[in-house]
Regions:
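N-terminal targeting and processing segments
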Residues: 1-38, 195, 205, 212-217, ...
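Intrinsically disordered, low-complexity proline/glycine-rich segments
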Residues: 1-161, 308, 315-317, 336-338, ...
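Short, well-ordered loop/turn elements at secondary-structure boundaries
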Residues: 18-20, 26, 61-63, 69, ...
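Residue-level detector of short, conserved catalytic/binding motifs and their immediate flanks
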Residues: 22, 65, 120, 198, ...
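Short aromatic-centered micro-motifs
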Residues: 23-25, 33, 67, 122, ...
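A general structural signal for short secondary-structure junctions and capping/turn motifs
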Residues: 57-58, 112-114, 192, 198-205, ...
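Intrinsically disordered, low-complexity segments enriched in small residues
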Residues: 131-208, 212-214
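Extended charged/polar low-complexity repeat regions
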Residues: 162, 188, 210, 216, ...
Length: 691
């Protein structure tokens, strides 16, 4: 078994050494670069061990201006190095005084001596230069790094204390991308039943995505009843211990430190920037969305999110009633979503006005225990939920009438799923838990074992064929190494912000990625040596993109929207948007244009091509396309089942019918008396095609 990556001193040291390893050698010896550190190694063979700690630290100061190695000026014979920081006799240690001489005493008084084992000299031409980029990064990140370290060290100790106190089970849940699930999903490491569903979406510069999430092992009351969370129940709660609890869009919680004005904190695991400015606390996520928490405080002590914005001025705004109950959302297109709640703050209905008509996007119903038992969509189609004691979900019946079931061992937050299945034995799993591993058997009698550490990260999977997949993570829970059952390895190296900078695939080929100071991807080098690059403006919008062939495409913006695109030949394409930020006209370099029209929900209803031909579209209340009229008069009609699967499609000539099975798998297709059927096993894997 491969244990998780060590978090101790040895593990950290190994990770640092690996990350520092260059990729360029001369005669099998590592090269030096401008900016690389040099450490004096005493000759222990001829001299006794030093009585004081060595301070003979140096740094390569210059390298070639025309030859780069690992992206920095390559240093060679006679290039100057910063040294001479061995100043006088070490002083007697005094309380409050530094134990080491400041690096500011470094001066360029040494030269690099080149030592190679074999081979002829390698000429490195060009006048000497410093590594300007590295120097800028040092000056730019020096103060920030010290501040993060100071805050981070202090804050990590606080997090450890909070976890020992068991502040909230939601703080122990991993991000979904880091979990391994099976069935209708169950988390392999914890036995947690985990369910998500997007109830509705609205387009816009910042789309409105109303998603709900359920965790069986976190009995927390909320705006969708116990154990359920929606994506806009975002808030921060001041803790007595000098920290904040942050409620994420998926309902999980993490901790953030209290800050002084002007301070910042970066949570690498969650990819969040936390800052305190004159307006208050602000959180910035990996997408660049900025969150402010000036909303009312809810009954659980959370200061609710008041706005979600982008750097170029788009914003979602939130309105609250007394007790921090969500009352409305104003979209980035200016639409008002009305949110109705009961006295406990539970959401009853979310609606929007569409061309003068109120459309109820989703409705919820609860039982006397505060559990959500029914959801009703825009087409008045329902899902039903049944729970056992402790708010444990035991049955879900979808819009098509099919049910999924869960059985547990234990009660409440300590319950773990031991059996899950769908009607007819679909997606059936039997689960057994051991110390540090989970054994599952599916309906096809295939067995799999998952091994995990204290952090609940899966580090080994033994599949039904005996094949072993191994994963190795770093201390930030980032996946660094995957070894598949055939023994091939995939590796990923990250920068200090947790962004991948080098990906080595199973064939040993590397992809390199570079970022700017705002964490924007600026270049990508493919295994074949091709380079793609991007440039950005102050709002982090792409203003140019250069292809491997050297062609550059440029983008210009006006008022937050894309206005022109200029291709590699200098041809300009002009885009025009309406006041709701829908693209309504595209003008080509030759003067021709295409036009689009939309309804009140932002759905395309008419498209006009460069010849003036018109195509028209119509939708149902759930945004399913039900009618398409082509320029020649041919009309396509579409019908759907309660799950949103297309069951009937026709035009002026043809007609096709479809039937579906569990989870929307296609069971049959019929056209012009030709009937094709599809058969699946209990894992919904295709096994048979008949006609």
């Amino acid at each position: 078994a491969m244990p998780p990556a060590a978090d101790g001193v040895a593990g950290v040291a190994c990770n640092i050494l690996k990350s520092m390893a260059p990729s360029v050698k001369v005669h099998n010896q590592w090269i030096a670069q401008a900016g690389i550190g040099i450490v004096h190694l005493p000759a222990f063979v001829l001299h006794p061990a030093p009585l004081v700690s060595g301070m003979s630290e140096s740094e390569m100061w210059m390298g070639s201006s025309t030859v780069l190695a690992d992206g920095a000026p390559c240093s060679s014979l006679t290039h100057p190095a910063l040294s001479c920081n061995i100043v006088g006799i070490p002083t007697i240690p005094r309380k409050g005084k530094p134990r080491k001489v400041s690096k500011a005493l470094l001066a360029p008084t040494s030269m690099l001596s080149t030592i190679t084992s074999v081979g002829n000299p390698v000429l490195v031409g060009g006048p000497p230069t410093i590594d300007v980029f590295a120097l800028a990064m040092k000056f730019g990140l020096k103060g920030l790094g010290k501040m993060w370290k100071k805050i981070g060290d202090r804050f990590q100790n606080l997090i450890d204390r909070l976890r020992k106190k068991g502040m909230n089970r939601l703080a122990d849940i991993l991000q979904p991308i880091k979990c391994k699930t099976f069935g209708e999903p169950v988390d392999a490491a914890t036995g947690r039943v985990y369910h998500t569903n997007v109830d509705f979406e609205l387009p816009g510069p910042i789309p409105v995505v109303w998603e709900r999430t359920y965790y069986s092992d976190a009995a927390v009351d909320g705006p969708l009843g116990y154990n359920w969370h929606h994506s806009y129940n975002l808030g921060i709660r001041q803790l007595e211990e000098g920290a904040f609890a942050f409620r994420h869009a998926d309902g999980r919680e993490s901790f953030l430190p209290t800050l002084k004005l002007g301070e910042s904190h970066f949570d690498r695991k969650e990819q969040l920037f936390w800052t305190l400015d004159a307006q208050g606390y602000q959180l910035t996520d990996i997408r660049g969305l900025q969150y402010r928490f000036d909303g009312r405080e809810n009954r659980f002590g959370y200061r609710m999110v008041s706005g979600i914005s982008t750097k170029d001025g788009f914003r979602l705004r939130f309105e609250y009633a007394s007790g921090g109950r969500l009352a409305g959302i104003i979209s980035s297109r200016g639409e008002f979503l009305k949110v109705e709640t009961d006295e406990s703050g539970r959401v009853l209905c979310v609606s929007v006005n569409q061309d003068g008509e109120e459309v109820k996007l989703v409705r919820y119903r609860y039982d006397d225990r505060g559990d959500m038992v029914e959801t009703i969509d825009a087409l008045d189609v329902s899902k039903h939920f049944v729970y056992s004691g402790g708010h444990l979900l035991v049955r879900l019946t979808n819009q098509g009438g099919m049910s999924f079931h869960w059985e547990y061992e234990g009660k409440g937050e300590n319950a773990r799923c031991v059996h899950t299945w769908g009607d007819g034995g679909v997606m059936e799993y039997f689960i057994r838990y051991g110390k540090g591993y989970t054994h599952i058997r599916n309906g096809e009698n295939a067995e799999t074992e998952y091994y995990y550490g204290e952090d609940k990260l899966i580090y080994k999977i033994v599949d039904a064929n005996g094949g072993i997949t191994r994963h190795q993570y770093n201390s930030f829970q980032e996946l660094e190494v995957t070894v598949n059952p055939e023994g091939y390895t995939r590796k990923t190296a990250y920068n200090e912000f947790g962004q991948p900078i080098r990906i080595t695939d199973e064939n040993g080929e590397d992809t390199f990625l570079d970022y700017d100071g705002n964490r924007n991807l600026v270049s990508l080098y493919t295994p074949g040596g091709k380079r793609l690059s991007w440039d950005y403006d102050r709002q982090d919008r792409v203003v140019s993109r250069t292809t491997p062939g050297g062609e550059t495409v440029k983008y210009a913006y006006d008022g937050g929207v894309l206005r022109t695109i200029t291709d590699g030949q200098g041809r300009v394409y002009t885009l025009t948007f309406n006041d709701r930020y829908d693209l309504e006209l595209l003008q080509f370099p030759n003067g021709l244009f295409r036009r689009w029209e939309y309804d009140g929900r932002g759905r395309l209803v008419q498209a006009v091509d460069v010849k003036g031909n018109v195509t028209r579209y119509a939708y149902d209340r759930a945004d399913n396309l039900v009618r398409l009229e082509e320029p020649d008069g041919n009309v396509h009609r579409f019908e759907y089942d309660a799950m949103g699967n297309m069951v009937h499609a026709s035009d002026n000539i043809r007609e096709v019918r479809f039937t579906y099975g569990a989870l929307g798998v296609l069971k049959s297709r019929e056209q012009e008396r030709h009937h094709i059927t599809f058969g699946y096993n209990s894992e919904l894997q295709l096994r048979r095609i008949g006609n």
